[in-house]
């Protein structure tokens, strides 16, 4: 047992170091690739967000770290930038529904054949959270220059239970209940 403890601590240290490298890489890529990364955010505010992520690394699980990286990139408020970690195999989209926003609310616009009865249904809530509340809570992680773009992109993010779970907005990382 004594031998395992240092190995576990070493693995944890290595993971924290790797996450710091990932964060540094993301920041460097933003500053090198983006033509005007600080057009919509002051550089000092961006640096505060990055430092907050850096300090929180020891407490973050994988999903929390991915959320933190998404927030860093979304903070520059550019709809053409974004991390798609929550659309990867690590966080499968288990929902068989696709939704879009309309003036009257959020509606199912496509779905698998076994859920065809839900086509055109209005989504009221996910895991008891009103859909509009979910969009508001997720907005700082969705890359967008304005509120319209957040509303447009939100359904892609909200169909990923792992994302909502990482935010503490649904109980399970691999499923949720949709209310119509």
Residue positions per predicted region:
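Flexible, low-complexity junctional segments that flank or bridge functional domains
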Residues: 1-180
């Amino acid at each position: 047992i004594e031998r395992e403890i240092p190995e576990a601590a070493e693995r944890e240290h290595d993971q924290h170091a790797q996450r710091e490298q990932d964060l540094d890489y993301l920041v460097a890529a933003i500053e090198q690739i983006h033509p005007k990364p600080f057009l919509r955010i002051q550089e000092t505010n961006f640096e505060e967000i990055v430092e907050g992520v850096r300090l929180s690394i020891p407490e973050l699980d994988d999903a929390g770290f991915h959320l933190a990286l998404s927030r860093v990139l979304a903070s520059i408020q550019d709809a053409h930038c974004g991390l798609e970690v929550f659309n990867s195999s690590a966080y499968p989209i288990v929902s068989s529904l696709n939704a879009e926003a309309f003036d009257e609310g959020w509606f199912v616009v496509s779905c698998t054949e076994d859920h065809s009865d839900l086509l055109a249904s209005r989504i009221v809530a996910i895991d008891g959270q009103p859909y509009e509340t979910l969009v508001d809570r997720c907005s700082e992680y969705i890359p967008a220059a304005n509120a319209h773009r957040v509303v447009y992109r939100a359904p892609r993010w909200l169909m990923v239970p792992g994302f909502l779970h990482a935010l503490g907005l649904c109980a399970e990382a691999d499923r949720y209940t949709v209310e119509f």
